[in-house]
Amino acid sequence: MGLTNDERSSLVELRLEKAKRFIAEAEQMLSMGLWDLAANRFYYSCFHAAQALLIHYGLSAHTHAGTLGVFGMNFVKTGKIDKELGAFFSRMEQLRMKTSNPQPIGFSGILLAKR
């Protein structure tokens, strides 16, 4: 059973609100030097924005990697989304994975500065 247009619009709006909230949180964390938390919030901002885009166009993905893949194939590779934004999303996913590791990794804000 698919979503109605109203349900789809509501879901897109909720995802975009979450993305905006997370990017504001990421900026705050970045200003405090909380690099790992900023990377996490930047990633989830990208993730929810990408999910909103997929939902809007009737596409879906069931995993984080799937979302990145569907987003890349349908929007970055087609030129609908700038490659720099696609690269930023990929970079934030990598940083999220690294910062989720309980072992110290020598993480700094250098990689985030490229955003």
Per-region residue spans from a language model:
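Terminal alpha-helical segments
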Residues: 1-115
